[in-house]
């Protein structure tokens, strides 16, 4: 899993402050905007934070990508297994961590599977993934269309997505997906996005009390 910055609105925070002062044109060019952005956050004036956007590149797997793509306030571009050979990203499918199902919460897992048992199960998963990749390659070698051959690939297959959204959308996404109730693998991505956000929107992050 990796997250990296692709692009951001130039002078993103200053741009939001400039637009926020639309009704006070005499002060629009003021460089003292930290207090204004803090005020807007404190009083839930969120439309201001829709005026700057950020694009991130995220490398994950197809299973987690499906969760990310549900955030419809963003725009996305994803690596196409229909157009391109999946092995262009990686010819190896990483074996996932294994956690026990929480019997009281279907959307939670507990990290208490014994190491010996986990290694044994992961060995079987690795064998299954290797077989899936060999079969995928065999189908392509026989001239089967990529759009058909891809159906034999597991959800753990690596993918790459570009995720673009406003500062406001990123705040919502990071708050939601870094909280309890999010799958660990997705939470790790949200926390990595948060680190990028803190560097690119330092005043906003400080006002949100993001550590």
Give names to the regions the model predicted.
Residues 1-211:
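Family-specific signature for flavin-dependent thymidylate synthase
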């Amino acid at each position: 899993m990796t997250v990296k910055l692709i692009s951001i609105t130039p002078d993103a925070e200053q741009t939001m402050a400039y637009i926020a002062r639309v009704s006070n044109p005499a002060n629009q060019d003021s460089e003292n905007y930290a207090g204004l952005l803090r005020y807007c956050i404190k009083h839930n004036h969120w439309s201001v934070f829709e005026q700057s956007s950020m694009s991130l590149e995220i490398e994950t797997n197809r299973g987690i990508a499906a969760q990310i793509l549900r955030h419809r306030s963003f725009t996305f571009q994803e690596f196409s297994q229909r157009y391109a050979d999946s092995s262009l990203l990686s010819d190896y499918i990483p074996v996932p961590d294994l956690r026990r199902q929480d019997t009281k919460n279907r959307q939670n897992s507990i990290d208490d599977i014994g190491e010996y048992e986990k290694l044994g199960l992961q060995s079987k998963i690795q064998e299954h993934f290797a077989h899936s990749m060999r079969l995928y390659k065999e189908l392509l070698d026989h001239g089967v269309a990529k759009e058909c051959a891809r159906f034999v690939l597991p959800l753990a297959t690596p993918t790459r997505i570009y995720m673009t959204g406003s500062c406001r959308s990123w705040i919502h996404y990071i708050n939601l997906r870094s909280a309890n109730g999010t799958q660990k693998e997705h939470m790790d991505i949200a926390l990595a996005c948060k680190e990028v956000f803190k560097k690119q929107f330092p005043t906003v992050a400080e006002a949100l009390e993001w550590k």
